[in-house]
Amino acid sequence: MTNTRKNHPLMKIMNNSLIDLPAPSNISSWWNFGSLLGACLTLQVITGLFLAMHYTADTTTAFSSITHICRDVNYGWIIRYLHANGASMFFLCLFIHIGRGLYYGSFTLLETWNIGIILLFTVMATAFMGYVLPWGQMSFWGATVITNLLSAIPYIGINLVEWIWGGFSVDKATLTRFFAFHFILPFIIMALVMVHLLFLHETGSNNPLGIPSNSDKIPFHPYYTIKDFLGLLLLILLTVTLVLFSPDLLTDPDNYMPANPLNTPPHIKPEWYFLFAYAILRSIPNKLGGVLALFFSILILAIIPLLHTAKQQSMIFRPLSQYLFWILIANLFILTWIGGQPVEHPYTIIGQTASILYFSLILIIMPLVNLIENKMLKW
């Protein structure tokens, strides 16, 4: 069996990626989230496939087909809620995964980091289009508001929006194409994940100390397979608890009303995982400025390697940077809270302050503090 595992053309790839992969001996549980994201993606593809068997991408029957799935299909309700809450778990793991990359300086592995950013944009696009499919009030108005943002692009904006809509408003054509894209994108995500892992295995994983670990490697199996399995059990526990006890905790009640183009909901807001970006978008009074801020709030991750002025890769020995990192995390929590609040005083000013702080921390304050720490360490 050992010879087959190491010599068979297909099994050799699996073996070098999952079994005999040399891994640093000191990576902590923060490194579990890569495998958890793989588990989330698998869950989403499987549940999504079963949902697609019963879903109809038509404005007149989409909402009814979701009701049919929940009421008439065998265990349809659990498949639907696993898919909806699985997306929340996906983004939770995604944010922690990115946060770990920032804290421990994994962004210095440039190819892996950049593919990760492309993956983030693709997953966000997939989740947005998935949110439109139930064709409830928030689905319809969310699609209208977010696609309308493209009209801020000078000269081609209006034509671009109508081209995406397939008409003069969000309608049947929009729903059909969103379903088509929502179905195909997870497979593109899978391909990108393979590229992400390919680049990661070119350099090897980073570790909490941020120092080369070539002199002290251990095989991935059994050490990290067992460790990842524990993380997986905890994720399953959290997801199943959410699905069975409070499946609608993270959804919007407005989405249980069929889409009505003549009636606007009082507060249009996306799912919780987009609220931080939505708060940044709303904090700028100018439409084009808001769209650019929204886009750069995520694209800013791409320039973080250029802003890394510290001599040490990891933050583990840099207390000032750690302090700023946790301020950034707290700031993101504030932005998430503000994104779900109505546009009125004092939420507006809090959102604007948090947005300015978000960009200031990443672009100005953290690089300067890195330089100060270099001086303190006489580097």
UniProtKB/Swiss-Prot annotation:
Which cofactors does the annotated protein need, by name?
Answer: heme b
This protein's assembly is summarised as:
The cytochrome bc1 complex contains 11 subunits: 3 respiratory subunits (MT-CYB, CYC1 and UQCRFS1), 2 core proteins (UQCRC1 and UQCRC2) and 6 low-molecular weight proteins (UQCRH/QCR6, UQCRB/QCR7, UQCRQ/QCR8, UQCR10/QCR9, UQCR11/QCR10 and a cleavage product of UQCRFS1). This cytochrome bc1 complex then forms a dimer.
Name the residues that bind a ubiquinone: H201
This chain is encoded by the gene named MT-CYB
Under the heading InterPro entries, the entry gives:
Cyt_b/b6_C, Cyt_b/b6_C_sf, Cyt_b/b6_N, Cytb/b6-like_sf, Cytochrome_b, Cytochrome_b_C_euk/bac, Cytochrome_b_N_euk/bac, Di-haem_cyt_TM
Binding site residues for heme b b566? H97, H196
- Asked if the keyword Transport belongs to this entry, the reply reads yes
Q: How many cofactors are bound and how? A: Binds 2 heme b groups non-covalently.
Membrane topology type, per the record?
Multi-pass membrane protein
Q: Where does the chain bind heme b b562?
A: H83, H182
Q: What is this protein called?
A: Cytochrome b
What family is reported?
Answer: Belongs to the cytochrome b family.
Other observations noted: Heme 1 (or BL or b562) is low-potential and absorbs at about 562 nm, and heme 2 (or BH or b566) is high-potential and absorbs at about 566 nm.
Q: Name one GO molecular function term.
A: metal ion binding
Query: Where in or outside the cell?
Result: Mitochondrion inner membrane
Pfam families xref list: Cytochrom_B_C, Cytochrome_B
Cellular component, GO annotation:
mitochondrial inner membrane; respiratory chain complex III
Q: What does this protein do?
A: Component of the ubiquinol-cytochrome c reductase complex (complex III or cytochrome b-c1 complex) that is part of the mitochondrial respiratory chain. The b-c1 complex mediates electron transfer from ubiquinol to cytochrome c. Contributes to the generation of a proton gradient across the mitochondrial membrane that is then used for ATP synthesis.
- Might you name a Gene Ontology BP term for this protein? mitochondrial electron transport, ubiquinol to cytochrome c
Provide this UniProt record's keywords sorted from A to Z. Electron transport, Heme, Iron, Membrane, Metal-binding, Mitochondrion, Mitochondrion inner membrane, Respiratory chain, Transmembrane, Transmembrane helix, Transport, Ubiquinone
Locate the transmembrane regions by residue number.
33-53, 77-98, 113-133, 178-198, 226-246, 288-308, 320-340, 347-367
Please name the CDD domains in this protein's record: cytochrome_b_C, Cytochrome_b_N
**Coarse class of the protein's main subcellular location:** mitochondrion
Superkingdom, according to UniProt? Answer: Eukaryota
Q: Does the keyword Transmembrane apply?
A: yes
